[in-house]
Amino acid sequence: MRETQGLRGARRKAGRTPRVTLIPGDGVGPEVIGAAVKVIAAAGVKIDWDQQLAGATALRRFGSPVPDQLISSLRSTKVALKGPLETRVSEGYRSINVYLRKLFDLYANVRPVRTQAGVHTPFRGVNLIVIRENTEDLYAGIEHQVAPGVVESVKIITARASTRIARFAFDYACSNHRRMVTAIHKANIMKLSDGLFLRCAQRVARDYPDIEYREQIVDAACMRLVTDPMAFDVLLLENLYGDIVSDLCAGLVGGLGFVPGANYGRHGAIFETVHGTAPDIAGRGIANPVAAIKTGALLLDYLDHGADADRIRKAVSTVLRAGRVVTPDIGGKAKTTEMTAAVIRALR
């Protein structure tokens, strides 16, 4: 099943090979992104990859986590496949993921979350789409020390961004035959900021009478998600709540190693693994490549290779269902390269 039907992508031009920025990332990034590239090639899709460095790897080589050549490449291609990037806690450079999303106005973060046969999870039949506003909220990064021991952080919510992400969510629901959009909020406490977000969602919802619209307070939504996730369909969230809830949803289906991610704007997109750099297993060749391969499938959807993307997703499902050639985190003994080869065999 296609994950991104109806999204405006970089459509193919007859006879032209699409050019895509490739950012392997840090830690296990090169291993899992390499797997995705191999699977895309095995599916018969030709892509002109422009490989660039970012994050800690780029900092060591170029003295900057976001080198000029990376930005130039992204401005040219307007689409990227990206691995995980190192972000230190409470020190160092700011998140490169957040920086790139804001720089290119990639305002919609989308994570399809589905259970997979062969993956042990507490639930069956989970089929959620988490849509997160990507450009403001506390992630605007406006914070300062007021006095020693006192720090202030500013939450920015605008009608423009809230309306834009709400319309994206409803358009997505319509294009992908979804039945319901639930706006997740904390307007009982943050009456102005979250209240504005809700009012914008409510106004947009009136334009989509065929899509059911609901609202739920974020803490209650988290409780409901871990007890009855099938009660949800498309989740619409502000930036911070979306970051937290999307990881919670990944936990319902086996973890971040099974969930792809995408960031969409009007003029481009970055497709990324949502898991971390996993430095404890980097270089050991045992990283789970599923999230990266499925993220590659999202890229193909965007490039108007939807049939090939579906073939890749089916091949991944075949390998997981069989359970014979899977990495240690899934209960197997296979290397990343061995599991990738199994997906390619299933693809053919």
Locate each region found by the language model.
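Glycine-rich phosphate/nucleotide-binding loop
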Residues: 3, 58-59, 224-327
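Short glycine-rich or small-residue beta-strand-to-loop segments that form or flank ligand, phosphate
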Residues: 19-25, 80-84, 181-187, 294-301
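Glycine-rich phosphate/diphosphate-binding loop of Rossmann-like nucleotide-binding domains
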Residues: 21-42, 147-219, 231-233
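Buried hydrophobic positions in well-ordered alpha/beta secondary-structure cores of metabolic enzymes
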Residues: 26-29, 78, 131, 169, ...
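Buried hydrophobic packing segments
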Residues: 36, 40, 201, 292-300, ...
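N-terminal beta-loop-helix "entrance" segment that forms/cooperates
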Residues: 46-69, 225
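Flexible, glycine/charged-enriched surface loops at secondary-structure junctions
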Residues: 47-51, 176-185, 208-216, 305-313, ...
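N-terminal glycine-rich phosphate/adenylate-binding segment common to multiple enzyme folds
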Residues: 60-155, 240
